[in-house]
Amino acid sequence: MNRERLAALLGRERDSFAARHPRSRAAYRAGGANLLGNVPMTWMNKAAGRFPVYLAEARGATVVDLDGHRYVDLCLGDTAAMAGHSPQPVVAAVRRRYAEAGGATAMLPTEDAAWVGAELARRFGVPLWSFSLTATDANRWAIRLARLVTGRPRILVFNWCYHGTVDETFITLDADGATSRQGNVGAPVDPAVTTRVVEFNDLEALDRELAHGDVACVLMEPALTNIGIVLPAPGYLEGVRALTRRHGTLLVNDETHTLSAGPGGCTLAWGLEPDLVPVGKAIAGGIAAGAYGVSAEVAERVAARRDADLIDTGGVGGTLAGNALSVAAMRATLEHVLTDEAFEHMIGLATRYTDGVRGVLDACGVPWSVVQLGARAEYRFTSPAPCNGGQSAAAADDQLDDYLHVYLHNRGILLTPFHNMALMCP
């Protein structure tokens, strides 16, 4: 690759981006007075154009920025808006709860909660559910319950995994073994103390680490999604389940991103049998909400621990978790938006996208790969497609990423800013 030419092309696109977005640039500069990093949340600084565009409005798969530019949104809030922006059934449910009935958060249950629990149980095959405000918290609380019932201190994750900002998951593999992930901010402890880590698709490594007998749970996405999409090899997930059972370790399937595989995520689509299932982001149509499901066996083991404080300050739960507004939005999303029929349509769109990208790559003789997981698809700068997180991370190219992102941005297309994922909504 001609890096000098790539740098020149990137500079040209960035100049064009800056010229096209004077109001967003002014808003970004104004934010520096009182916002850390100029933005409401520091991740928003991941912008190939050197500053983010500012949102004016969004509906469905269309975003309009402060300067009036319209975009086809294939980022969809990095999955949080997988139901599309402001779907009408969710808008109506939120209006009823907040404006008509009132009581957005009264720390009291509503009848919607039982409906949502039953629907999640139907989709994921895990019978008992509890709610959070984020998928990160759903993962945290699932880990706490796993430690409670197993009496074991550690968890196991996969190299270059993503499970929100759960402290224990900021661990990777290098030539010397497990190490804290580069850039890990203010880590409370060395994650090697709390966590074991292996490569995805490596059953021998998993068996070896679980044999230590100190792992409460394996926390995993059934397919990696945040280091590019890495699919499981044939028989791999069945092997993971067999090994966790053999070693007395619980299996936690984080379906927050892999919900794109279908109405019940990979758990339903692939017939998986996890012990706990955290999920979040998309399940409330863009309103903050998360949930975690537990098997009947885990629930019985939790109930048997009379010393565990699940009512007050035992470390599981939160004041806003399960609030009436979020639960109403979850019900509307699951009942009317992210339906079986909607997923069929979304997956069809993703297949069309995947076939189109692959066709362009083949026609141009570009040695990249494109991988689909239900309603999401992603290209990587290598072929064949990576089979684990380490391989996928090694294929990353920040300069090329920036160029493609700002190029597409200037032509009205948004991809997720952290990699090259395209997600479809109903």
Which role does the model predict for each range below?
Residues M1-P426:
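Conserved N-terminal phosphate-binding loop of PLP-dependent enzymes in the Aspartate aminotransferase
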